Amino acid sequence: MLVIPINLVGTKYPLCVNCHRQIRLTTNAGADFAGAKTVASPALGDRLRPDMIITPKIRGFICTTAHPEGCAQHVAEQIAIVKNRGLIENGPKKVLVIGSSTGYGLSSRIAAAFGANAATIGVFFERPSENGRTATAGWYNSAAFEKEAAAAGLYARSFNGDAFSDPVKAEVIAAIKADLGKVDLVIYSLASPRRTEPKTGEVYKSVLKPIGESYTNKNLNTTTGVVNEITIEPAEGDDIEQTTAVMGGADWQLWMDALLEADVLAEGVQTVSYSYIGPEVTWPIYKNGTIGRAKEDLENVQRALDTQLAPLNGKAWVSVNKALVTQASSAIPVVPLYISLLYKVMKAEGSHEDTIEQMDRLLRDRLYSGSPQPDNAGRIRVDDWEMTPQVQETVGKNWDEVSTENLSQLADFDGYQTSFLRLFGFGLSSVDYASETEPDVAIPSLS
């Protein structure tokens, strides 16, 4: 039985007592309810539905709301891009994506499913709608993906839980054994501020700090559009070790060990995790900072995994991807200004890609083309268009000159903001944001 406490005083539609939102209560047949302070429905098939108008609410680098129809449309647009490029020849057939609900992980799942007709299992940690709050964007993305996959006749199953934990690993392995037998591609795309070590229970927390000395440079306040200066104090204590424990390769190794032990990796299996290098202006806070140390650990694990997978004729890769607006990148100081400048230059020359174009190119032109084109360190580089001398020279010149006053001329800040809002399902032209929508959306395989 669903019970919703409401207050009917002085409103066209009642107010939810819990969240104070204006809501419209309807049955599946569409009839309005009114005249009672508490309404109960005896059957889920005719349950009350609190529709509401959902708007973006931004706090710092996070949007605390998400729009279900907008997220679904964003997923649909990514699918269309992949399908328009045709089938990936000799692509993966059974894919596990660890961290599959947003950003590069979501686009990886879409590219595999709709570019190669792959069966996919996705793992993520997202929050459903509850108590008048919207679900997270990743929840809506995953619901939309599963519905689109079902319509296309593709297997898709999702697991919502702590991917760092042993129980989630065990559940996923059981599903692979039962439904797929073995997987031929494992994508590791987790970004998290903390990780609980499954054996000891110790909680590690990551930090974004330079190493050795403080770092001062230009920064963009993405709320106000002001270009100012920011100083970030250096790592101290065990910051480096903590960050490496969260963002390094330890959990990737644990996943691959568990999958190998369970004998659910196919002959010729490939696994890939993601990294970023970027230009020198970002190195103190990224490549040479605490997160950079974690990525060094990731590359060490990649080399170890490559050896472990050799008996299966398998390969492990680190893919260095382009700087893009994602929920993870928006949290890194300095990087949003760089991305805004980069977007301006790459869009002007016609080389701009978003996450879906990046992941489609990774699968289509690198992992499954027979020509992965690794660099001298063995990494796959799909940041290659970003890092061309022509692009970097122009971005570097504009970095030196950019200020609050000329931001709109030198940078694509509007594009940055648009991309940020789209992550949460806002700003898509085909969605009517003035209409009420149902925030409670189910993920089919979790229902």
Residue ranges and their predicted role:
Residues 161, 189-198, 215-224:
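Conserved NAD(P)H cofactor-binding loop of Rossmann-fold oxidoreductase domains
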Residues 90-124:
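Canonical Rossmann dinucleotide-binding motif of NAD(H)/NADP(H)-dependent dehydrogenases/reductases
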Residues 117-155:
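Glycine-rich phosphate-binding loop and adjoining beta1-alpha1-beta2 segment
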Residues 16-19:
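Cysteine-centered motifs
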Residues 52-76, 150, 281-297, 301-447:
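NAD(P)H-dependent oxidoreductase Rossmann-fold/reductase module
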Residues 206-313, 320-343:
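Catalytic loop of short-chain dehydrogenase/reductase
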Residues 98, 183-191, 270-275:
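Rossmann-fold scaffold of SDR-type NAD(P)-dependent oxidoreductases
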Residues 171-200:
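A glycine-rich helix->loop->beta "capping" turn
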